[in-house]
């Protein structure tokens, strides 16, 4: 039984899909006016992992993640660069895929662009106007929050508190300060589409409501995104969607917490961000994913070079274990398991059971990773050169099986690792010739930390794993 923390009801609940064995999941994707930063990357990695885990547990997942490709920020960027908004969108969607692929984020079932759904959005807006939930003023169309009885139920605030606490730009044309635009009249220099209210473009909130409804249906299983989207974006999505259809919009709402730098939320507006591409130039995708999944997705995560280095060391420990097993598979002579080994292999299932228990409990990736470490500690101790090839192979398959939903630990250590070690040994040999013994010792210690021991023999330097 999988339990998820439902932001809507402020508690963990058993996940029961609308259709048995299927999950309809919508995740708010990027506004494509720049490279995405590692804070955005955490959101994408978290929900990629959750999607993978549902699939691991046997569900068929329809996973929709949108691109916001018409937006104030995009218009500003296009005007600054003297190109069209479409060109900005095309460019940064391509860049998104490059970085997401590099982070081993699986492609969505569908990645809709808002501009592909303008006709559907206009129908959606017209439906809200016809039902009395929205009104037009000078070509703008606003959603009337007071008309929707449940407004504020996701963020847990009542509308009076929201009015008094929110910093709202004064617009005398609105019936209420909390009303928000679902269609915006064209301004000079902006792209626009013809509508019953004149030339204009959709508001941000209406885009996701419309695409989710069109691609997944009036009620979906899971709507997810970063916790900064809870209000107003997701609150407004609920209001629009449920006002139009009269049905619950999403049964479960999942929100991932911020990534912080110096105890402040990482964001483009604060200019304290690192793009995913910058980090990928220096660290492997497994390292970045490990760091992003090392805390529960609802816990804020601090980001620093030290934590990246710690994640790198942890990932290397697991790949050392994988490398040991790969070497044993090549080196051991006995093919099949004996009865004692079969019993030992069966005992390893306790780590899989612990892993599933933790992931079933609101996707606790931090504790699931601990279960993998416990597994490799066991295999490092008990699977040796005297073991069978079959046992080493089965243990390796189990490590990879548990790593797959996390998007990690799938690479082979053969070739690349050996080349890297040989290069370090050559560097150490040169340091010794140059009588730079401090560097030679540093390289030896670095290799030892990675589970590699050097032996100086008359035939030259040999290395082995420990």
Swiss-Prot record:
GO molecular function, one term: zinc ion binding
Gene3D superfamilies from the UniProt entry: Cysteine-tRNA ligase, C-terminal anti-codon recognition domain, HUPs
A Pfam family of this chain: DALR_2
Subcellular location: Cytoplasm
Keywords for the protein's UniProt record, in alphabetical order: Aminoacyl-tRNA synthetase, ATP-binding, Cytoplasm, Ligase, Metal-binding, Nucleotide-binding, Protein biosynthesis, Zinc
Disulfide bonds: none
Single GO biological process annotation from the record: cysteinyl-tRNA aminoacylation
Sequence motif: 'HIGH' region, positions: 30-40
Family: Belongs to the class-I aminoacyl-tRNA synthetase family.
PANTHER family linked: CYSTEINE--TRNA LIGASE, CYTOPLASMIC (PTHR10890:SF3), CYSTEINYL-TRNA SYNTHETASE (PTHR10890)
Entry protein name: Cysteine--tRNA ligase
